[in-house]
A protein has these predicted regions:
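Active-site-proximal inter-transmembrane loops
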Residues: 73-76, 135-161, 167-168
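Non-catalytic, topology-defining segments of multipass membrane proteins
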Residues: 1-126, 131, 171-179
C-alpha cells in the first residue's frame, strides 16, 4: 500500500489522462481481465478493431461499476469519484492555460499541454486495447488475443507487452524487458 500522499499524487496524475474515474477505470479493467475475448469484455477485439480502439469509450457510458468494493473504502478514490470532472478539466486544460498566461502563450500551452497531450495519451492507451490484441507475438499465453508489441511498448513505457500483462496480471512489471 502506498502512502496517502503518493496515492493522492497518483490520483491527480490519473485524472489528467481523462480516462474515467479510478472506480470506473478499475471496474472496466478488472472485467476485461475476467471476461477477456468474450461478449462481456468492455474492450473486446472480437467486437472489431474500432470497438477495441475507441468504440468502447463511445458505447460504454452507462456500464455498471462493479468489482471494486475494495477501492470504495479508500477516501482518495471516493474524493476523485465525486469530483472527477472538476479535477480532470482543471488539471488537463485550466492549469496549462494559466501556465501559458504566465509565459505569454496561453493558447499554445492549452494546445500542447492540454488538447494534444490528452489526444496522444488516449490513442497510445487505445493502441493497447486494439493493436495489442491484433498485432504482435504471444510468447506467454498463445490461446488469448493479447499480444506483445515492442513498438507499442516503446510508445507506452512498456504497456505494449500485453500478452505478458494478461498472463502475469499480478506482476507489477509491464513485461520482462526493461524497455
Amino acid at each position: 500500500k502506498a502512502h496517502r500522499f503518493i496515492q493522492f499524487l497518483a490520483m491527480l496524475s490519473g485524472s489528467m489522462a481523462l480516462q474515467n474515474s479510478i472506480l470506473k477505470w478499475c471496474s472496466d479493467h478488472r472485467t476485461h481481465h475476467k471476461k477477456l475475448d468474450t461478449k462481456e469484455d468492455p474492450y473486446s477485439i472480437t467486437k472489431g478493431f474500432f470497438h477495441a480502439h475507441i468504440g468502447w469509450v463511445i458505447e460504454n457510458k452507462n456500464a455498471e461499476i462493479k468489482g471494486v468494493n475494495d477501492l470504495k473504502r479508500n477516501p482518495i478514490v471516493m474524493f476523485q469519484e465525486k469530483n472527477y470532472w472538476t479535477i480532470s478539466i482543471m488539471l488537463s486544460f485550466v492549469v496549462p492555460f494559466i501556465i501559458g498566461l504566465i509565459y505569454g502563450r496561453p493558447f499554445g500551452s492549452l494546445l500542447w499541454g492540454g488538447i494534444l497531450r490528452v489526444t496522444a495519451v488516449h490513442h497510445f492507451t487505445f493502441f493497447i486495447n486494439s493493436l495489442c490484441h491484433f498485432i504482435g507475438t504471444r510468447p506467454f499465453e498463445p490461446k488469448i488475443t493479447a499480444r506483445d508489441s515492442w513498438w507499442v511498448a516503446f510508445l507506452t513505457f512498456g504497456e505494449g507487452y500485453h500478452n505478458f500483462h494478461h498472463k502475469f496480471q499480478w506482476d507489477y512489471r509491464n513485461g520482462i524487458k526493461w524497455y
